Regions:
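Canonical positions in the second alpha-helix
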Residues: 27-28, 61-65, 97-98, 131-132
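Residue-level recognition of tetratricopeptide repeat
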Residues: 44-45, 80-81, 114-115, 148
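Helix-start (N-cap) detector for alpha-helical repeat units in TPR-like alpha-solenoids
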Residues: 36-37, 70-73, 106-107, 140-141
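Short coil turns that delineate tetratricopeptide repeat
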Residues: 33, 67-69, 103, 137
Length: 162
């Protein structure tokens, strides 16, 4: 996430520290408080800084102002925060909302797979990783996670065999 933040505006600005980026986002957000994009960027900044509560506040604002067809962006960010907080059922609900809004976006499917892995619901995770690959066949992290889960399930099955 830090790299994503630092790459924002890299064509217009020299390499900047996280604090400089955060300050720049805050100044622009003061001028345009209804920008869901800026609120989402601010949430990303707070996630990088480890301030989940502040990130959620920014995402609430982003959800309020985002057009319906773009609400998956702040929703999937919120799902990741909930996932990291081990609020997996909430993360599933929010990530599912993101998939319903943007079913063509592979990252939404991948996020659901990640949450199901955390819940140790490996079969459900496989379904979501496979749907990720249907949307984006070269998505290497999804391929790697499928292999890892399949290996885990085979080992688990082997332990149960008489």
């Amino acid at each position: 996430l830090t790299e994503v933040l630092q790459n924002l505006g890299k064509d217009q600005y020299p390499q900047q520290s996280l604090e400089q980026i955060g300050t720049r986002i805050a100044k622009v957000l003061e001028k345009n408080q209804t920008s869901w994009v800026l609120s989402s960027m601010a949430a990303l900044y707070w996630r990088v800084k480890g301030q989940g509560k502040k990130a959620i506040d920014c995402l609430r604002q982003a959800l309020h102002y985002a057009p319906h067809q773009m609400k998956d962006v702040p929703l999937i960010s919120l799902a990741n925060i909930l996932h990291n907080a081990k609020l997996w059922n909430d993360a599933v609900i929010v990530a599912t909302m993101a998939v319903e809004i943007a079913p063509h976006f592979a990252v939404n499917h991948f996020t659901l797979g990640n949450v199901y892995v955390a819940m140790e619901e490996f079969e459900k995770a496989l379904v979501w990783y496979e749907s990720t690959l249907k949307l984006q066949p070269e998505f290497v992290p999804a391929k790697n996670r499928i292999q890892t889960i399949q290996c885990h399930l085979m080992l688990k099955k082997g332990r149960r065999a008489p």
